[in-house]
Each structure stands twice: as structure tokens, then as C-alpha cells.
């Protein structure tokens, strides 16, 4: 097990490594742990900003289709109203997934900021990795490029934990999602549900009933 001085050097990157450490580090990332956490946080902010833009575009698309539903109702074109309502339902399903991801990543970002300040890697970073892994899987079918970004971020944070483990002798199981990770995701989903109600108006009852009848006939 490495000593405290080794950990401090790897955390802040201030001291010169020994010859043997230089050889060993040829196979590792050369940035100190703290620097890598700062960069991970920067990447998270960029991802969150992209999600926000994408959600805004979906909201605008939803608004446009909602107006067409109303227009179709006025003209008594129930088939067209149902078509627009179906598309709105799909847009809102995707939007809720993106909102949940955005909110959860905001929580992850806050956690990373705290970890960067206090250096509490094992008790705080492992649940974060679990959250990112779950979100990566969800995003595969929605935004594949975002899923790839999250996979890279997850891998980088796992390396931080594993390297920190060399100094503490601690072991971690990345395959098992922690209760805290599940709690973060559940809370994000609940907040996303509430925001959906605030951001998106309910479909007119006529369009909703037509939509349900259309789906029933398709079964």
C-alpha cells in the first residue's frame, strides 16, 4: 500500500515522482486525480448545456404540434388530431428521459465539486459512477452520442477511484448500483415529472380520447 505522501502527490500533482514511479506511470494517466475531477466536471457542464438546448428544441416542437392538434379539432379532423397527439406523446416521452438525465447530471456535478474540494473519493464518487452508468444505458436509445460521452466519463472516474484505491487499500464493486445512486435517479425522475407538468400543457380531452381509440384499433 502506498503512503500518505504518495496519495498527496497523486492528488495535487505537486511533488516529483521517483524513477520507479515514472516507469509505472507510463501506463497511467499523467494528470493528478484532482485535475481529472475538475476536467470531468467541465465535461459534465458541457453535456448539461447540450441537453438543455435539445430539451428546448423538443419543447418548441411540442408547442407547434399542440397548436396543430387544436386546429385539427376546430376543423373536426379527428384523424389528423390523433396523428399529432401521437407525435406529441412520443416527444414528451423522450423529453422526460432527457430531463431526468439532465437533473441527475446536475446532482452529479454538485457531488464532483464537493469531492474536488475535500478529496473524499471512495464514499462520494462511487455512487456518482453508478448514476452515470445508469444514464448511459438509458441514453443508448435516445441520444447514442451522449451515451458514448457518458461511457468515457464513467471510465475516467473509475480510473480515479482505482488509483485512489492503491493508496487506501480499499476495493470497490462497480458492477453493483448503490442505494444512493438509485436514490439520486429516483429523485431526478420525480423532479422531471413535475417539470413536465409545468412545461407542457395537457392535451385537449377530445384529442386524448381519439388517440386512445386509435391505439386500441391498432392492437
Curated annotation (Swiss-Prot):
Coiled coil: none annotated. InterPro entries: Cell_Div_Machinery_Comp. Disruption phenotype: Deletion mutant forms small colonies on selective plates. Forms enlarged cells, with a highly elevated content of DNA. The keyword Plastid does not apply. Induction: Expression is highest in dividing cells. Keywords: Cell cycle, Cell division. GO terms for biological process: cell division. Part of a cell division machinery. This is Cell division protein B2. It comes from Sulfolobus acidocaldarius (strain ATCC 33909 / DSM 639 / JCM 8929 / NBRC 15157 / NCIMB 11770).
Amino acid at each position: 500500500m502506498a503512503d500518505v505522501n504518495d496519495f498527496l502527490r497523486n492528488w495535487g500533482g505537486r511533488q516529483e515522482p521517483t524513477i520507479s514511479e515514472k516507469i509505472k506511470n507510463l501506463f497511467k494517466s499523467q494528470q493528478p486525480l484532482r485535475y481529472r475531477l475538475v476536467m470531468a466536471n467541465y465535461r459534465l457542464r458541457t453535456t448539461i448545456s447540450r441537453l438543455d438546448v435539445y430539451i428546448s428544441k423538443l419543447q418548441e416542437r411540442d408547442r407547434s404540434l399542440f397548436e396543430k392538434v387544436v386546429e385539427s379539432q376546430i376543423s373536426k379532423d379527428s384523424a389528423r388530431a390523433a396523428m399529432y397527439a401521437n407525435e406529441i406523446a412520443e416527444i414528451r416521452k423522450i423529453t422526460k428521459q432527457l430531463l431526468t438525465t439532465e437533473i441527475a447530471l446536475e446532482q452529479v456535478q454538485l457531488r464532483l465539486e464537493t469531492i474536488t474540494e475535500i478529496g473524499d473519493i471512495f464514499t462520494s464518487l462511487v455512487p456518482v459512477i453508478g448514476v452515470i452508468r445508469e444514464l448511459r444505458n438509458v441514453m443508448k436509445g435516445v441520444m447514442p452520442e451522449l451515451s458514448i460521452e457518458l461511457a468515457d466519463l464513467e471510465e475516467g472516474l473509475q480510473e480515479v477511484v482505482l488509483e485512489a484505491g492503491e493508496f487506501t487499500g480499499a476495493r470497490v464493486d462497480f458492477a453493483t448500483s448503490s442505494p444512493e445512486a438509485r436514490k439520486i435517479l429516483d429523485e431526478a425522475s420525480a423532479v422531471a415529472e413535475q417539470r413536465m407538468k409545468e412545461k407542457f400543457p395537457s392535451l385537449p380531452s377530445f384529442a386524448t380520447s381519439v388517440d386512445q381509440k386509435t391505439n386500441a384499433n391498432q392492437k
